[in-house]
């Protein structure tokens, strides 16, 4: 029983990262029907941004430690990563959208942006792995034989709060209703006076900011960074979003946790080399049975 409970909490933490990243994929796809394959590398870049922000703040403000350092780093990282997402949208996606480019070209562009971010970080910062600094003091609670850390709780709570906040924004706010309206008919929406480009810009900013939250928490939890760290976790988060039902916020959230649970419990019972194989086979079976994912809805498209 202890073994199960301990791995249950480990799976919650690991699934939280997948969920937070998957929500970013879901947000952009839900509005534009665009899979932003660079999202995993935006997550990676946010970790580097947080790393250098901590170094800068620690060097220039020696008394800044603990929670204040974490909050300032988090807010600044979210803002800078949001600017990165907006810049990518303005420079890469918006021109293609204005020209009515085929979706294949948009997908290729997204992949190229990811490669640029990876190799740009590689060229500037080198291939050597960097160790993410300790920002918050880690508290360990032993509940019987089960060990839970304060960081683990922070990660899980952050994922839940982000999900709830995103649901509120999309379902209850005027901007969220505009986002949903664009997903239904982006050509008719300008006739209703809704500023399409402004809504799209906000969508990319919000999705990138979510990646930043995941990035800084991931760096604190697994403090080894490299330029390619976002590639695999980004692809897995995308698959989790698809399994949950791409474009559905609840589906992306649950899909991330599902993948986290599969990976942790496969590793608990089998050699770690089987983790990806078994995980992807299970996810493939799920998609074979229900191609739209758990919460996705089949839609007809006129061609």
What positions do the PLM features span?
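Helix-loop-helix "hairpin" substructures at the membrane interface of multi-pass membrane proteins
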Residues: 14, 147-225, 249-255
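Cytosolic-side transmembrane-helix boundaries in multi-pass membrane proteins
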Residues: 109, 187-191, 195-198, 270-303
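Extracellular/periplasmic helix-loop junction at the C-terminal end of a transmembrane helix
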Residues: 115-143, 268-275, 295-303
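Membrane-embedded helix boundary and interhelical linker motif in transport proteins
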Residues: 39-87
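Hydrophobic alpha-helical transmembrane segments of polytopic membrane proteins
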Residues: 81, 236-259, 282-287, 294
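Single transmembrane alpha-helix segments in multi-pass membrane proteins
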Residues: 4-53, 91-101, 105, 245-249
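Short loop segments and helix-boundary regions at transmembrane helix junctions
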Residues: 31-35, 83-128, 169-172, 232, ...
């Amino acid at each position: 029983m202890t073994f199960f409970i301990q791995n249950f909490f480990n799976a919650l933490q690991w699934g939280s990262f997948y969920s937070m990243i998957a929500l970013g994929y879901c947000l952009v796809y839900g509005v534009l029907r665009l899979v932003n394959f660079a999202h995993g590398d935006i997550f990676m870049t946010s970790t580097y941004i947080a790393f250098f922000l901590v170094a800068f703040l620690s060097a220039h403000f020696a008394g800044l430690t603990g929670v204040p350092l974490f909050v300032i780093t988090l807010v600044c990282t979210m803002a800078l990563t949001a600017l990165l997402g907006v810049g990518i949208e303005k420079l890469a996606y918006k021109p293609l959208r204005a020209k009515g480019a085929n979706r294949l070209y948009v997908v290729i562009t997204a992949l190229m942006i990811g490669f640029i971010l990876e190799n740009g970080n590689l060229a500037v910062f080198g291939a050597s792995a960097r160790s993410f600094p300790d920002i918050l003091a880690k508290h360990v609670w032993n509940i019987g034989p089960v060990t839970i850390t304060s960081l683990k709780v922070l990660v899980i709570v952050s994922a839940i709060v982000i999900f709830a906040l995103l649901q509120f924004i999309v379902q209850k706010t005027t901007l969220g209703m505009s986002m949903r309206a664009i997903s239904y008919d982006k050509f008719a929406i300008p006739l209703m006076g809704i500023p399409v480009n402004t809504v799209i810009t906000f969508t990319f900013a919000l999705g990138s900011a979510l990646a930043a939250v995941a990035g800084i928490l991931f760096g604190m939890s697994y403090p080894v960074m490299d330029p390619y760290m976002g590639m695999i976790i980004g692809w897995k988060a995308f698959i989790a979003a698809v399994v949950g039902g791409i474009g559905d916020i609840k589906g992306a959230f649950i899909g991330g946790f599902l993948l986290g649970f599969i990976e942790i419990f496969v590793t608990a019972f089998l050699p770690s080399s089987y983790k990806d194989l078994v995980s992807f086979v299970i996810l493939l079976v799920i998609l074979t049975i229900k191609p739209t994912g758990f919460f996705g809805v089949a839609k007809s498209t006129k061609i």
